[in-house]
Amino acid sequence: MNLLPKTREEFAQTDYWNEFFKKRGEKAFEWYGEYLELCDQIHKYIKPADRILMLGCGNSKLSMDMYDTGFRDITNIDISPIAVKKMLELNAKSRPEMKFLQMDATAMTFPDESFSVSLDKGTLDALFADDEPETRAVVENYFKEILRTMRNGGRYVGISLLQEHILNFLLDFLPKHNCMLRIVHCLGVEQANKEKNADDALTLPVFVVVATKFKSLPMPVLEFGFGNDKMQRFTTVSELNSAVSSVQKAALVCNGLARSNIAGHNEVIMDLHRPSEQTPRYTIHILDKPPARGLGKYAAFIVPQGREVEWIFSTPAGRKKLQDSANFQRLAVVTLHRDQVYSTLDEVKQELADSIKNLSPAGLTDQIPYLSLGSDVGKRETLICGFSKISGDFRIEEVEANGKTLRRLIFLSNQFVVQSEALVKTVKIKGKKDRKKIDFGYLACQHHLYMSVGVQLATTVQHPKRDVEKDVLVVGLGGGGLCSFLHAALPQARITAVEIDPIMLEVAEQYFELKQDKRFHVVIDDGLDFVERCRNEDIHFDAVLFDVDSKDLSLGMSCPPQSFLATKILQHIKEIIGPKGLFMLNLVCRDESLRTEALNNLHKVFPAVCSYKLEEDINEIIYCANDEKYKTVEQWKKNMGTAGRGLNSAVKETKLASEDALEVAEFLSELKI
């Protein structure tokens, strides 16, 4: 099975074509392949009984090889008398039935409907050298003559590189003239060219254009074939254009990668599809580092299913770190997509082999090593496919990672980010079937741990009385992992969670074992409206947490939405937490100017602001207080240290963990005002 490449890169294709033809000159037309590479397509669309017209035969051996394999009724024409004379002398004795005539293909003298096949190897490309009006007029006459001399049901079979203006012309002209149009990518020709021109990284894909003539067609018939796979049928010419263009663009990417090192530039990203499928089967990130002694040349790393969301595989910085540890100059990082079936790692390698080879540096002769985390492709089980009016399609999945079973909530609008994750434990019950249980002591998102320290600070250090319940507001529920942890670890906390999406509450209860009781309840409401109502009704909380993501992925700040940092909302929070309370938010910001603006807004409202930046993630936890004593980082560290140690004790006392949850000293060293 072949994989159809679709690149996300943009290139100036015209410059590339110009370089290709300038470099090769007259030898450019050797690129179209000989009989051996083309025979599969020739025998598929041309039969020995056909009356064949060879358009612009030149000195090509194609018609001779066809004659020798049983195609006897072949008429060759060429505008050059020298070429015709030479071919007659060469074939008179050995191929007596084959005809060679000097004739202009744009003004042929044959009667109407003389042939059942018109074969064109590169002649169209030679005629259509540019897109000037005079050239287009010549090409239009060429095709009118082909159709005039062709019987109904006959076929034009053209071997072409399909430059953009040629493709556009064919897609416009042929359907209008009642021709069924099929375009097939000739992988055999392309592979042979690469082998014959191993030192030349400048390559182009070759296509077979098959246009079948009908008296009339009620609707256009447009098809594309990738190699020897079944045809993909389209309803519009733009879809067929896109299929051809995607192959050409991918070739340009592969050529660029063969000719140059992209160290210091962005990664190159390529999706691999099965023909006729719109969703990718694989995504490949290609990254380079400068040549250095001791580095391997090139390797591919296959990410097991379910692991693609981890930082080291899902971010450019993480993949750079992976490349450093792999110790290769070029690394192709391959991720496997959900809703696809993969059997064994060896079969995945075999399926990827040609695509991975196409991305290699020029001149590479060594076998390409395949790296992974184990000997299989990983395990991913979809528990449910759902839809949210707010967040769109989502999945609940279980994956195996490092010997653990993890249950995840994934939004398909941003499917390389885990929205919620829980550790699933298997509970063995004597005489009964094993039961799965969510481990509430597992915090998948590291930022939840640092928010929990803040809650510990607000509910114990700030308010030491143990017999009084402290109120905590969490805006943003998701799968409920943070709320379940706080509820289990901090018995003094009375938690209110606000979630705008009712589907998320169902997901949290049914798949993440979220349970409401007298110390924990969920309100379905807009978080901003709820905050405003609390302020208006004089409702106070000891801790307020914003753990909300933005649905607009185009912005440089994905958490929280910018509306949550409006001065009016922050003023409401200031009043709600009172003199002793704490406000915490998870800030995820790639745009430094937006981050600065967010921090400035917080400083304008709150007397004391402190932050902790997670080492590998871009998450940053911001702590805000009204208490003047927190104006120094020393005071923050003193009380956060007490809170951190208290949280470690709490998780052990409640049997959520047997070890400390937080490295207190490390955490305190990175706290900043």
UniProtKB/Swiss-Prot annotation:
The keyword Hydrolase does not apply. SUPFAM superfamilies: S-adenosyl-L-methionine-dependent methyltransferases. InterPro entries: Lys/N-term_MeTrsfase_sf, Methyltranfer_dom, SAM-dependent_MTases_sf. Keywords: Methyltransferase, Multifunctional enzyme, Transferase. It catalyses: L-lysyl-[protein] + S-adenosyl-L-methionine = N(6)-methyl-L-lysyl-[protein] + S-adenosyl-L-homocysteine + H(+); N(6)-methyl-L-lysyl-[protein] + S-adenosyl-L-methionine = N(6),N(6)-dimethyl-L-lysyl-[protein] + S-adenosyl-L-homocysteine + H(+); N-terminal glycyl-L-lysyl-L-glutamyl-[protein] + 3 S-adenosyl-L-methionine = N-terminal N,N,N-trimethyl-glycyl-L-lysyl-L-glutamyl-[protein] + 3 S-adenosyl-L-homocysteine + 3 H(+). GO terms for biological process: methylation. The keyword Transferase applies. One of its GO terms (molecular function) is protein-lysine N-methyltransferase activity. PROSITE patterns: CPSASE_2. Its EC number is 2.1.1.-. Dual methyltransferase. It catalyzes N-terminal methylation of target proteins via its C-terminus. It catalyzes dimethylation on lysine residues of target proteins via its N-terminus. Belongs to the methyltransferase superfamily. This is eEF1A lysine and N-terminal methyltransferase homolog. It comes from Drosophila melanogaster. The lineage of its organism: Eukaryota, Metazoa, Ecdysozoa, Arthropoda, Hexapoda.
